[in-house]
């Protein structure tokens, strides 16, 4: 059985073919065969029982994609790979008014992760901040105003600050044009023509007559209600008397029924007596 590292090749001009007759080859010939293979001396690791040496031996070099995620200035294994001599500078970040980049912090060591490239969004605090954040987002009222053309929205340049209020300038509305949205419906001006009532002096004759008519109507309704109550009570009394009469009638009929039943029970005995009396005579 041949070894895995032995290969068959054509004999050269000045070389004798190898003979496997059981004789052991010299150390020089075997060393030339495995010249391309790398060997690792494990004696130092086997003799010492330290786990750090074994972890250093079986350390796996990370993929290039994983190293690129950490940036060219931060090596994956600072103990084995040298740092990149070229300086790396992060590009300047342009954030909105509600974002800001982290300043220089405690992460100043060359092998540590630099969080300055991460943008942190500040959440608004308090009712003022929540109102400012709601204004900076999508506002359906602004869209409806722009669509209808009935009001003009003027937003100041520093709208991101919650202290500045939102100003709405109303334009004159057409009297015949109805509002296109119920949210933008203009309130009706307070006036006697829109309410349907006019101011009446309490000392005037018209006001007194109206009050008198109202009082008369109230008295009539009350008297009518009282009459209905009396009629209902009268009907209740009549129904109760009728019920009593019906009950007495039922009792009378029950007694008559019992009497008739007793008579029918005595009829056959009377017939037999009559027959017996007729036969004896």
Swiss-Prot record:
It comes from the Eukaryota. The modification Phosphoserine is found at residue 181. GO terms for molecular function: DNA-binding transcription factor activity, RNA polymerase II-specific; RNA polymerase II cis-regulatory region sequence-specific DNA binding. Keywords: Activator, DNA-binding, Isopeptide bond, Nucleus, Phosphoprotein, Transcription, Transcription regulation, Ubl conjugation. Disulfide bonds: none annotated. GO terms for cellular component: nucleus. Residues 1-30 are annotated as: Disordered. It is found in: Nucleus. It holds the Pfam family bZIP_2. Phosphorylated. Residues 208-228 are annotated as: Basic motif. Residues 204-267 form the bZIP domain. GO terms for biological process: DNA-templated transcription; myeloid cell differentiation. Binds DNA as a homodimer and as a heterodimer. Can form stable heterodimers with CEBPA, CEBPB and CEBPD. Interacts with GATA1 and SPI1. Interacts with SMARCD2. This is CCAAT/enhancer-binding protein epsilon. It comes from Ovis aries. The gene is CEBPE.
